[in-house]
């Protein structure tokens, strides 16, 4: 009886080894477990994936910091590696911009302030060009000045005006786009640009966005508050609009309108504008400064956001507000060493209620 039992167990063991330990069986088992985890434990899987990504970002960031500190003595001697750099510094605003690994510099920025007389709210702009620098340069050189003039007129008779910061922003952005399209169409220049504009007054912050440059604010509690939302072709609202216009989106490294443009709204881009698949309409948001009591805001081209999340960027800058560029230079270099291939432009604006900021 015992011998029969042992023989049976031995036979079962051989059968299990033959079937269960075969490579094909193990492969199918792994696939089944993966599918089961995906469909029945989606949240847990997402958490694990997100944690893994954050860990990789953290390691890459630490390596980047070591590289920054070891290369030729630190930050102040790295400019030669970036081909070209640009910077701006005021008492509460700092900008740092690099050409990076690109052959051409297509980013532009502008700062217009009148803190003494306050004839208009402060104007901050980021313009990330594509298909050449023509569009970004055109918008940078004309839109802020046009806004300044209209805002000065508005401030003189604000109480009786039917306008607002939002309507002025929308009117001037659309006007500049129409004006630029006429000129670029004649010269067959297909360049385009993003447009991120922030108007800062005593009580309000108004932000207009076209494209995928982005603004983020750090509130009194250290939270990252989005000031804008990227216009991307894969978003449901944008995808439906593009389809209604007779267009399509396809994946070529990223989702693109007509297989060409990686954003669904822009200024310029006359061939896609003629098809009505890309539009210049800005999204405009207004924020109550008394309620948020912000410490600083970040306005940046997508070169930064390809390397940093909103929350990570806020934490990074918050720890470096005492630096000469309020952390703008450090985060640009960090993005570069994380492998960003694009032009990178970062503007940091400190608010007057920040304990580290002078009277605005």
UniProtKB/Swiss-Prot annotation:
Q: Kindly list the places in or outside the cell where this protein is found, as annotated in its UniProt entry.
A: Membrane
Give me the Cytoplasmic side stretches, as residue ranges.
Answer: 43-360
Q: How does it sit in the membrane?
A: Single-pass type I membrane protein
- Per the UniProt topology annotation, the Extracellular ranges are 1-25
- Cofactor binding annotation: Binds 2 magnesium or manganese ions per subunit.
Q: Name one GO cellular component term.
A: membrane
The record's GO molecular-function terms, alphabetically, read: metal ion binding; protein serine/threonine phosphatase activity
Where is this protein primarily located?
Answer: membrane
Its recorded reaction(s) are: O-phospho-L-seryl-[protein] + H2O = L-seryl-[protein] + phosphate; O-phospho-L-threonyl-[protein] + H2O = L-threonyl-[protein] + phosphate
Q: Where does Mn(2+) 1 bind?
A: 128-129
Q: Where is the PPM-type phosphatase domain?
A: 92-351
EC number(s) given by UniProt: 3.1.3.16
- Record's InterPro entries? PP2C, PP2C_BS, PPM-type-like_dom_sf, PPM-type_phosphatase-like_dom
Tell me where on the tree of life, at the top rank, the source sits: Eukaryota
By its UniProt entry, which PROSITE patterns does this protein fall under? PPM_1 (PS01032), PPM_2 (PS51746)
Return the Pfam families for the record.
PP2C
Family note: Belongs to the PP2C family.
Give the multimer and partner information: Interacts with MAP3K7/TAK1 and MAP3K5.
Write down what this protein is called.
Protein phosphatase 1L
């Amino acid at each position: 009886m015992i011998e029969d039992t042992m023989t049976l167990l031995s036979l079962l063991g051989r059968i299990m080894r033959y079937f269960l330990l075969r490579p094909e069986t193990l492969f199918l088992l792994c696939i089944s477990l993966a599918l089961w985890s995906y469909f029945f434990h989606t949240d847990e899987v997402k958490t694990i994936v997100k944690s893994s990504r954050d860990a990789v970002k953290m390691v890459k960031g630490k390596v980047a910091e070591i590289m920054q500190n070891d290369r030729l003595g630190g930050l102040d001697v790295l400019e030669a590696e970036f081909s070209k750099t640009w910077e701006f510094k005021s008492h509460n605003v700092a900008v740092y911009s690099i050409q990076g690994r690109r052959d051409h510099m297509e980013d532009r920025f502008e700062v217009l302030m009148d803190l003494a007389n306050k004839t208009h709210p402060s104007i901050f702009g980021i313009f990330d060009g594509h298909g050449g620098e023509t569009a970004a340069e055109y918008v940078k050189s004309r839109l802020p000045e046009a806004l300044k003039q209209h805002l000065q007129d508005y401030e003189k008779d604000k109480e009786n005006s039917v306008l607002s910061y939002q309507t002025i922003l929308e009117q001037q952005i659309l006007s500049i786009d129409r004006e630029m399209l006429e000129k670029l169409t004649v010269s067959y220049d297909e360049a385009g640009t993003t447009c991120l504009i922030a108007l800062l007054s005593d009580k309000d912050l108004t932000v207009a966005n076209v494209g995928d440059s982005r603004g983020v604010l750090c509130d009194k509690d250290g939270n990252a508050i989005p000031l804008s939302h990227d216009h991307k072709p894969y978003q449901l609202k944008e995808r439906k609009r593009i389809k209604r216009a007779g267009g399509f989106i396809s994946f070529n490294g990223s989702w693109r309108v007509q297989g060409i443009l990686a954003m669904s709204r822009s200024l310029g881009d006359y061939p896609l504008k003629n098809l009505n698949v890309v539009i210049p309409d800005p999204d405009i948001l207004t924020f109550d400064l008394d309620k948020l009591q912000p410490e600083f805001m970040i306005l940046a081209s997508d070169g930064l956001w390809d390397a940093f999340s909103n929350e990570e960027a806020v934490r990074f800058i918050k720890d470096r507000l005492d630096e000469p560029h309020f952390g703008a230079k450090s985060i640009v270099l960090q993005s570069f060493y994380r492998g960003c291939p694009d032009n990178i432009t970062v503007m940091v604006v400190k608010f007057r209620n920040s304990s580290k900021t002078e009277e605005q």
